[in-house]
Amino acid sequence: MAIARRCAYKIHPMDITKISTGDNPPEEINVIIEVPVGGEPVKYEFDKESGALFVDRILHTPMRYPTNYGFIPHTLSPDGDALDAMVVARSPFVPGCVVRARPIAVLMIEDEAGGDEKILAVPVDTTFPYYNRVGERSDLPHIVMEQIEHFFTHYKDLEKEKWVRIGKWGDKDEAFRIVRESIERAKQSK
């Protein structure tokens, strides 16, 4: 017979409003992780109202995320969501954690909902110095960009009425511009 145990701790939803965009945006940003690198094909999303992490959907195409994936708080993309961010790291980060990161590029994507830019970033040097010499996407192995493009090209393949078109990669300056614009857009929407 199984004995029920009381949980010794409570999980409290995160108050996203108390997490800043970063110490020095756009050069240093905070990314709230929703999906870890190599994670199961489950798309999680934070609910802005409750601060809880919800399962958005199980990806129909059995693929694993090539980076840690999340969003930059207090930003707003043209699609109405927070600005997406991919954090390259050798280790998976737990969904719900906040990672301080440096943008190095941006991938322009269009899907059935419209434009959907994704910032490519690496952890700040004090978090993980492995990437301290990475200043642009060209400093990463080329296969990293190929894996990211392949993932986003195909991860919706088996979902009806969904599609993705990969656009161009923008450099660090373009990523900074998009971060700044998304911060301004979020401020204006309040």
Residue ranges with predicted function:
Residues I11-K190:
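Hydrophobic N-terminal alpha-helices or hydrophobic patches in metabolic proteins across all domains
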